[in-house]
Amino acid sequence: MRIKRDRYLNQLIERRNNGLIKVITGIRRCGKSFLLFELFAEYLKENGVKDEHIISLPLDDDINEKYRDPHELSLYVRSFVKDSSATYYILLDEIQFAISREELKNPDVPVRLYSVLNGLLHLPNVDIYVTGSNSKMLSKDIMTEFRGRGDVVEIHPLTFQEYYACCAGMDKISAFEDYATYGGLPLVLSKKTDTAKIQYLKNLFQEVYYKDIQERYQIEDSDVIDEMTDVLCSA
């Protein structure tokens, strides 16, 4: 299943080679990686960019654990930038994996990764795109950390138009009922039963969003979040 996200793809295209770090943010599992590694990379290749000039690195993959160290990441990227006459497109996914726990926990501790990315931006022939989705990747934080060199593209879950385009054989009313019930996270479309959709969303909320909230606001007692959630959901 291939979902078109033309609205966001066009935003990346418009920002191409603008001298800033394109930062793709958004809630977990809303399609940031797919947009960057599939749709945008495909666009680049279709418009004449050679494979060797696209440096893609998913930092959530344990095979790339070494490059979660910002210094190693910098060395890795720079090792590919050899042809001064060509533009290199650096696509880094889930950059929060290159931010240490201490940097995440303490807002007063500078994030080394941001210095590395700012340093890479000094190379005259690179165009940088990154994705991230945790509490250190809020738009206001990014603009502060990148010192005016960040250009944020905020991704949202699927609109109903995007959602319905993937609902082959389903009438629009039924599709909207599903959309209104389960929302527009792309992976929901791959779940075949109501039970599977509910379980996916429940697991995502418990394992991901709770953790981000606790991390962002340094909440040690998870019962506080449970109680707040109950109040909001019953309102």
Q: Residue spans of the language-model regions?
A:
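P-loop (Walker A) phosphate-binding loop of NTP-binding proteins
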Residues: 27
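Pre-Walker A adenine-sensing motif
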Residues: 2-19
